[in-house]
Amino acid sequence: MHELGIMIHIVEKVSALAEQNKLQEIQSLVLQVGELSPVVPHFLEACYPAAVDGTILEKTELKIEVLKASARCLQCDTIYPPVEHKTCPNCNSKELTIVGGREFLIKEIIGY
């Protein structure tokens, strides 16, 4: 489970941002995780309490938004969800490029 290491890194980055901006408390942290990302949202949530223990984020609410995957057909340029359609729903081509769903981002930090 590499999510613990990832979450510790996020906590360090957010803590540094809080210090730079002279924040006393972080109320919420919003992450975006693409459904094709190797990061598993459930595991991030499970290790979050251990990662924030004793930090400025200890009382912070974690929110995780899962971003749907999207692909572009290389034959007709149709954008479609590759998890739901193994071929292009417009032309049945199997040639595609992934254009979304691999993201892993800190979307929002709310604090004061």
Language-model regions, residue ranges each:
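Short microdomains enriched in Cys/His and/or Lys/Arg
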Residues: N92-Y112
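Short functional micro-motifs and their immediate structural scaffolds
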Residues: I79-P81, L96-T97
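Compact Cys/His-rich metal-coordination microdomains
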Residues: P81, H85-P89
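Short aromatic-glycine motifs in intrinsically disordered, low-complexity regions
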Residues: L17-N21, N90-T97
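Short cysteine-rich clusters marking metal-coordination/redox-active sites
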Residues: R72-C73, C88-C91
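Long, charged N-terminal interaction/targeting segments
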Residues: M1-E58, K63
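Short, intrinsically disordered, charge-biased short linear motifs at domain edges
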Residues: E58-I64, R72-I79
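Short metal-coordination and nucleic-acid-contact micro-motifs, chiefly zinc-binding Cys/His arrays
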Residues: L67-A69, E84, R102
